[in-house]
Amino acid sequence: MSLDTAEKQKLIETHQVHPTDTGSAEVQVAMLSKRISKLSDHLQGNIHDFSSRQGLLKMIGKRKRLLSYIKDKNIQRYQELVKKIGIRG
């Protein structure tokens, strides 16, 4: 479940830290969250797709590590990102 170029560009524009930013932790978390959402929808209808489930768990772990990094570096940016993406209640 990959993202097309237009979706990626939109995510980059909404979460970038500076104008030429394409790979900051915030952008990576936003892209992972979108991919996780798409893959979760896929797994709702394909419950026996175990390889996709494994990939989903890897993406969730990576997002968790990136969020932990952001939280350690700047708690304010972490709180804004979580609110903007809509994760963690």
UniProtKB/Swiss-Prot annotation:
Keywords: Ribonucleoprotein, Ribosomal protein, RNA-binding, rRNA-binding. GO terms for molecular function: rRNA binding; structural constituent of ribosome. One of its GO terms (biological process) is translation. It comes from the Bacteria. One of its GO terms (cellular component) is cytosolic small ribosomal subunit. Gene3D superfamilies: 6.10.250.3130, S15/NS1, RNA-binding. InterPro entries: Ribosomal_uS15, Ribosomal_uS15_bac-type, uS15_NS1_RNA-bd_sf. The keyword Nucleus does not apply. Transmembrane segments: none annotated. The keyword Ribosomal protein applies. Part of the 30S ribosomal subunit. Forms a bridge to the 50S subunit in the 70S ribosome, contacting the 23S rRNA. HAMAP family: Ribosomal_uS15_B (MF_01343_B). One of the primary rRNA binding proteins, it binds directly to 16S rRNA where it helps nucleate assembly of the platform of the 30S subunit by binding and bridging several RNA helices of the 16S rRNA. Forms an intersubunit bridge (bridge B4) with the 23S rRNA of the 50S subunit in the ribosome. Belongs to the universal ribosomal protein uS15 family. This is Small ribosomal subunit protein uS15. It comes from Prochlorococcus marinus (strain MIT 9215). The lineage of its organism: Bacteria, Bacillati, Cyanobacteriota, Cyanophyceae, Synechococcales.
